[in-house]
Amino acid sequence: MRVLGIETSCDDCCAAIVEDGVKILSNIKLSQKEHKKYYGVVPEIASRLHTEFIMSVCQQAITNAQIHASEIDLIAVTSKPGLIGSLIVGVNFAKGLSIALKKPLICIDHILGHLYAPLMIKKIEYPFLSLILSGGHTILAKQNNFDDIEILGRTLDDACGEAFDKVAKYYKMGFPGGPNIEKLAKNGNQYAFNFPITIFDKKENRYDFSYSGLKTACIHQLEKFKDKNENITKNNIAASFQRVAFENLIIPIKRAIKDTNIKKLIISGGVASNLYLREKIKNLEIETYYPPIDLCTDNGAMIAGIGYLMYLKYGASPIEIDANSRIENYKHTKGKTV
């Protein structure tokens, strides 16, 4: 079965053709450079550019896959969560294409796409732990199947990638913040600033994360946390921030490993491409899996891949289905999440 996957939840306009859930025939992504001068994504600009480019991006995906549009068997599209204007563009385009081609439509949760991305490259036996790190989400989950997910912890404020973007914006390090901070950090002292690590000890929050305190310390309280022998430089700020941002993740992950006795972890989302993070995770001495870089960030292939499985199990979505900006509450739930 050939699936066209469409992803427009934020500022990347993506489309891909995937066969039987794992064979990627094409994977096209158009990143919107217009946001760089604002040091962040402007929702109105994002939705307007999606409207402008979505048809050509989908056509390129079909062309690169060396198929005709009539050979598409299913259309999968991200319908939640994300920027509502961007989501509406993708969902409405997918609906129109579904009607025009007389092909079934399945609406997919963006989070499920990220969780599935590593499995497109390597077969991993369930259950395993999953960590999603992106500009919009920081989620630690236990996965028993592709549609059986228990959220163990999530950020209580800023997402990990969001904190990177905000710190980078304040110090004019460039957008997106993640890759630019990682680059600057290579020439900095990661112990120049002793920023606070936020860990929750209450049972109901023991797997949760928080980045607002770190962000505030890094932006407004540099002198308070500076080593007296170090200078305030962008490189030192970046290196120290990056170290603590990822140390914030380690203790909840260790707790989840101990409590579930699961020794397998998959990590996805844009922040998962950070090489410093990957070195930190190595110290956990467990089986760790990452998707390739082009599947870490938002992409249409992961939507097509999980769309194939969801369609086989649950069938098509009703054509009346709408986009939804809110994140699904998966905690202790199982079943249809479209």
Curated annotation (Swiss-Prot):
Keywords: Acyltransferase, Cytoplasm, Iron, Metal-binding, Transferase, tRNA processing. The keyword Iron applies. It is found in: Cytoplasm. Fe cation binds at residues 110, 114, 298. Gene3D superfamilies: 3.30.420.40. One of its GO terms (molecular function) is iron ion binding. Pfam families: TsaD. Signal peptide: none annotated. Substrate binds at residues 132-136, 165, 178, 274. Its cofactor is Fe(2+). It catalyses: L-threonylcarbamoyladenylate + adenosine(37) in tRNA = N(6)-L-threonylcarbamoyladenosine(37) in tRNA + AMP + H(+). The keyword Cytoplasm applies. PANTHER family: TRNA N6-ADENOSINE THREONYLCARBAMOYLTRANSFERASE, TRNA N6-ADENOSINE THREONYLCARBAMOYLTRANSFERASE, MITOCHONDRIAL. Required for the formation of a threonylcarbamoyl group on adenosine at position 37 (t(6)A37) in tRNAs that read codons beginning with adenine. Is involved in the transfer of the threonylcarbamoyl moiety of threonylcarbamoyl-AMP (TC-AMP) to the N6 group of A37, together with TsaE and TsaB. TsaD likely plays a direct catalytic role in this reaction. NCBIfam families: gcp_kae1, T6A_TsaD_YgjD. Belongs to the KAE1 / TsaD family. This is tRNA N6-adenosine threonylcarbamoyltransferase. The lineage of its organism: Bacteria, Pseudomonadati, Spirochaetota, Spirochaetia, Spirochaetales. The gene is tsaD.
